[in-house]
Curated annotation (Swiss-Prot):
GO terms for cellular component: cytoplasm; cytosol; exon-exon junction complex. This is Nonsense-mediated mRNA decay protein 2. It comes from Schizosaccharomyces pombe (strain 972 / ATCC 24843) (Fission yeast). The gene is upf2. Residues 412-421 have a biased composition (Polar residues). Residues 422-433 have a biased composition (Basic and acidic residues). SUPFAM superfamilies: ARM repeat.
């Protein structure tokens, strides 16, 4: 209110008071009425009804006109009751002022005859019980568990008390009432015999006091708390000039009018009483603040522990925060009226906004984090860059903003040094600022929103926040909030910067944090409800919003855990994917943050139990395990990195990185240049780490090792033996932890088999070794096997698939064809007996059988595969020639393959394919078959040697035979009967019978004539011995081939 309006108001009060006093003294010429007053019953009754229901500012003129024209004298008692009832219905200020003027006009006409009963009725309406204060507990219904008044009861009581008190104060200022003596005689009886009223209305010393002083004393009664604090605050604000002005007021004219209206004594008394009341209110507000913080912390902890927020408690807490905010605002207003400094702790309302909106962090008024909070979160972040991004924010106070503006301006003017140029730039800056002030705010906001997608750094975010500081209006805030909530689904990388901007601007208004939290929460619930209808980019964007709001501590922790709980309720693949994204985004933060550490640990344990109890697919299980490992990786010791020498680095780059199919020969040339005596161990370690080589480059490594065999055979044999030994050891010990390494080794030995660097028998033995003994027993006895370790079975099956995919066709075309056919049936039984296999392994199973043996049927049921295997084994058993009681699957010694002589399962039909007949004419074979006392191992050894030799002869490639030298044309030698008394054969037999010499025919040619002559060569010469051995071997070979063809099934 301006000074002129205030002076006019005070003069009006003084004029009305003077007229009221004159009317009280009996002056009848103050209020002029019509000479002929209307005494119509109908009009007078209508006036009474209108006083009861239509006492408003719109009807003021009609009321004044009727007061001047109607008699109304006979109806004064009814009018007093009706007008009090009408005043109780007035709520608006203009209606109250109009009603005061109407009552003041009636007071001028009828004086005490109307005023006394009217004031008595009004006072009785305000005080139903004369001995009780306005804030007595009898006016409210207190809760049973809490000493608090319900909001409904409090609001209804305030709506009733506020207008009545306003009427009485206005009546006092206008002179309608002065002290209780004016109406005390009209009050109901308070005799001690009356059970209803046991105390008098007023004490004798209070009858002489102004009614306003008594009313304010009653309002400032703190015996029953501060329930009427809003009423007192509104009245003090409204009548601060009339009732609480001090003597040192600057405006002397106003002070003089106030002194005439309200004496200094009573103003001083009211200020003193109000000052005492504010002191008590300050202590009360401090207690309420502590109680609020305690309840807030308690509710937050309970919601975090249960991962299920209690909405009723948080709604009650929100209402509690609103009441505290109202009390603190009233405290600040009363302190301002009394010109006293209010407590800074009570003036800070940000903490209540954060608590009501669910903010977890505690910041001071400038937005800085407290030192205790800094200590608690010191170990939350991985590096200082994350700490500064999520924990350090600019302050929006005058000093910091001026400093930031000056730093930005200096950075833009970095190249300018001279003072004159600096002054010119400052003038330009001022001019541009003036121009900007003339620009419409909407266009500036448009430009600001267009620059949001380019905000991709911490510095740009701070600058954008500072720029918005000058655009802080309700409309601009709403537009910015809408832009922050509508990020394109393919631009999830902008979410951290957008949320940081909202965190900085939350110092200006809590709308930024609450709006983003509500948007993210509703979007997440809608996404979980719709399941797979959302695209991956949309899911990632929503989860990123939740995570960033959690890291900036804008979203309450109980809401975050509520999102986690929604993901594990149904535990579908969609929920698992969302849960994994949440864990990877903010799971580590929640696990490290002190307030949520225990809850997050219990939540991770619940996820582990749910995972074990659910039959998850391998892909879903892998995704969830990776997320859990990312959140809480196992503790490991510090890995000391071994410093490699220059040669080791060169070999690592040469073999494990650059080795490909097209550079095997250059690599071989470089390796040959090494000193193989001094660098033997380095070369061995590098080549043995086959898992460090690219999986597609293992073929090149096998070819490289085959080429090295010509120069360093011992080294190559050492590498192959150790690789096989490592594989056998891993299979026997069920060491499938480093399964990727074992798969690489299996691929490596398979590539060696393809290029004939490794014998087929070694691969076959390894394949049979991958089928465990208990499985074969179950196949033979036709009983279902007991699965003890499904992970071990899956590891073995994957090794089998790798080997068959790499060298399966090569093995099936070798001498082990029948063995491999039997093995493929056993492999199908082994695979189909598993209870449940992943889809990828099922597809590999179907593909590998068709790749190795296209004509073989792929069985999909265990019973069919078992019957086929049984028939196959029965046919082999019937065809066995040596021992009908011998088992079909028998352990074979693998000493010729690996140095540790591992036991493998080798079908004996391999020997049956290459076994020769007893009637062979070869000397060694006939001796072997005729010696019954010889050991069975020697027989198997010799049979194996014959099989290997036969394989060498039959598997020679056409390319190798093309490069061999063609033998000379064998023509029959001419016979000379005149010089030889016996035919050629006879002479040859005679010469062969001689022990000292052997006859050879030498064929020569001169011109077109051939000539022959005989030579006697000593029998001990190398030519004679090699010729005899060659003839013997050819005879034996022809007989073996003939017998095998005859015995072929």
């Amino acid at each position: 209110m301006s000074r002129e309006e205030q002076i006019k108001k005070l003069n009006q009060y003084l004029d009305n008071r003077e007229l009221a006093f004159r009317a009280k003294d009996g002056d009848k010429n103050i209020f002029h009425t019509e000479s002929q007053l209307d005494s119509s019953l109908k009009k007078n009754t209508a006036f009474m009804k209108r006083c009861k229901s239509s006492l408003t500012s719109e009807n003021y003129d009609s009321f004044i006109k009727e007061i001047k024209t109607l008699s109304l004298k006979k109806f004064i008692p009814e009018i007093t009751a009706a007008i009090v009832e009408g005043m109780m219905k007035c709520k608006a200020t203009k209606d109250i002022l109009s009603s005061v003027k109407i009552v003041w006009a009636l007071n001028l006409r009828f004086s005490t005859a109307f005023t006394g009963p009217m004031l008595a009725n009004l006072y009785c309406a305000l005080y139903p019980n004369p001995g009780y204060s306005l804030c007595h507990e009898s006016y409210f219904e207190l809760k049973q568990n809490e000493n608090e008044v319900s909001e409904k009861d409090r609001s209804s009581h305030l709506l009733k008390v506020r207008p009545l008190l306003r009427f009485l104060i206005e009546f006092w200022l206008n002179g309608v009432v002065g002290t209780p003596e004016d109406f005390v005689s009209y009050l109901p009886s308070t005799d001690s015999n009356d059970k209803k009223f046991r105390k008098p209305w007023f004490e004798e010393q209070n009858l002489k006091k102004p009614l306003v002083v008594l009313l304010f004393n009653d309002l400032m009664d703190t015996r029953f708390g501060f329930l009427l604090l809003p009423v007192l605050t509104s009245l003090v604000r409204t009548f601060s000039c009339e009732l609480f002005t001090t003597e040192d007021f600057e405006d002397k004219e106003t002070l003089e009018l106030v002194n005439r209206l309200n004496p200094v004594v009573w103003r001083t008394y009211l200020r003193k009483s109000l000052n005492s009341y504010v002191d008590k209110l300050e202590v009360y507000c401090q207690k309420r603040k502590s109680l609020f913080e305690e309840l807030n912390k308690q509710y937050q902890e309970q919601s975090i522990i249960r991962a299920d927020p209690n909405n009723e408690k948080f709604q009650r807490l929100a209402n509690f925060s609103k009441s505290i905010e109202s009390e603190f605002s009233s405290y600040a207003s009363l302190s301002e009226v009394l010109n006293r400094k209010a407590s800074e702790d009570l003036l800070e309302l940000n903490f209540m906004e954060k608590a009501s909106s669910g903010t977890n962090s505690v910041f001071n008024a400038s937005g800085e984090r407290s030192e205790s909070a800094n200590v608690e979160t010191a170990q939350v972040w991985d590096d200082r860059e994350q700490y500064f991004f999520y924990e350090v924010f600019p302050n929006f106070n005058e000093g910091s903003i001026a400093e930031m503006k000056s730093s930005i301006y200096e950075s833009s003017q970095e190249g300018i040094r001279s003072s004159s140029e600096n002054n010119k730039k400052e003038d330009d800056l001022k001019d541009s600022t003036g121009d900007l002030n003339t620009t419409q705010v909407s266009s500036r906001v448009d430009n600001f929103l267009l620059k949001l997608p380019s905000m991709v750094s911490l510095e740009l975010t701070n600058e954008m926040a500072l720029e918005f500081y000058d655009l802080n209006t309700k409309a601009s805030r709403n537009r910015l909030i809408k832009a922050l909530c509508t990020i394109p689904r393919t631009s999830s990388f902008l979410v951290p910067y957008y949320v940081r901007l909202a965190r900085i601007l939350s110092q200006l208004s809590s709308e930024f944090s609450t709006s983003l939290v509500d948007h993210a929460r509703h979007s997440f619930k809608r996404m979980i409800h719709r399941k797979a209808k959302h695209e991956y980019d949309t899911r990632l964007l929503i989860v990123r919003y939740i995570s960033e709001l959690t890291k900036f501590q804008l979203m309450p922790f109980h809401m975050v855990f509520e999102c986690y709980k929604l993901c594990i309720n149904e535990f579908t693949p969609f929920d698992l994917e969302v849960l994994a994204l949440l864990l990877e985004s903010c799971g580590r933060f929640l696990l490290r943050y002190p307030e949520t550490k225990l809850q997050m640990q219990s939540f991770l344990e619940a996820i582990q139990k749910k995972k074990l109890a659910s039959a998850l697919a391998s892909q879903d299980q892998l995704v969830l395990e990776n997320a859990l490992h990312f959140v809480n990786p196992p503790k490991r010791g510090i890995i000391v990195s071994k410093k490699k020498s220059l040669k080791e680095e060169f070999l690592y780059d040469l073999i494990q990185i650059r080795l490909k199919d097209d550079n095997v020969f250059p690599t071989l040339l470089l390796l040959r240049k090494f000193d193989w005596k001094d660098d033997y161990q380095i070369l061995y370690n590098t080549i043995m780490e086959v898992w460090n080589i690219k999986y597609n480059s293992l073929n090149a490594l096998a070819r490289l090792l085959s080429a090295l065999y010509k120069f360093h055979p011992e080294f190559c044999i050492h590498v192959i033996d150790d690789t096989l030994e490592s594989l056998f050891s891993a299979v026997n010990n069920s060491d499938h932890v480093e399964k990727q390494k074992r798969l690489a080794q299996a691929r490596f030995i398979s590539e060696l088999c393809v290029i004939h660097m490794l014998d087929v028998r070694a691969i076959t033995n390894f394949l049979f070794h991958l089928l465990p003994l208990e499985k074969f027993e179950s196949f033979l006895t036709m009983k279902a096997s007991t699965l003890t370790n499904i992970n071990n079975d899956m590891f073995r099956l994957r090794l089998i698939v790798v080997v068959l995919q790499t060298c399966g066709p090569s093995i099936i075309r070798s001498k082990t064809k029948k063995t491999m056919l039997t093995y493929l049936l056993a492999y199908q039984c082994y695979f189909l007996i598993q209870p449940e296999m992943p889809l990828d392994m099922l597809y590999e199973f179907e593909d590998v059988i068709g790749y190795v043996r296209p004509s073989m049927k792929v069985y999909m049921h265990y019973e069919e595969a078992r019957n086929a295997l049984t028939e196959r084994l029965q046919a082999i058993s019937d065809d066995w020639e040596e021992d009908d009681t011998r088992p079909v699957f028998q352990g074979a010694n693998d000493g010729d393959i690996s140095s540790n002589e591992e036991s493998v399962y080798l079908p004996e039909d391999i020997s049956d394919e290459s076994e020769t007949d007893e009637e062979s004419s070869g000397l060694e074979e006939s001796d072997l078959l005729d010696s019954e006392d010889e050991d069975i191992d020697n027989e198997m050894q010799l049979s194996r040697e014959l099989d290997e030799e036969f394989e060498r002869l039959t598997n020679e490639s056409l390319l190798t035979r093309m490069h061999e030298k063609n033998p000379g044309f064998d023509v029959p030698l001419p016979l000379r009967a005149s010089s030889l008394g016996s035919p050629y054969v006879t002479r040859n037999e005679e010469s062969a019978s001689e022990s000292s010499h052997v006859m050879f025919t030498l064929l020569t040619k001169r011109g077109n004539k051939q000539r022959s002559q005989y030579l006697e060569i000593p029998s001990h010469s190398s030519l004679v011995r090699s010729t005899k051995n060659q003839q013997t071997e050819e005879i034996m070979e022809r007989k073996r081939v003939k017998e095998m063809v005859l015995n072929f099934e």
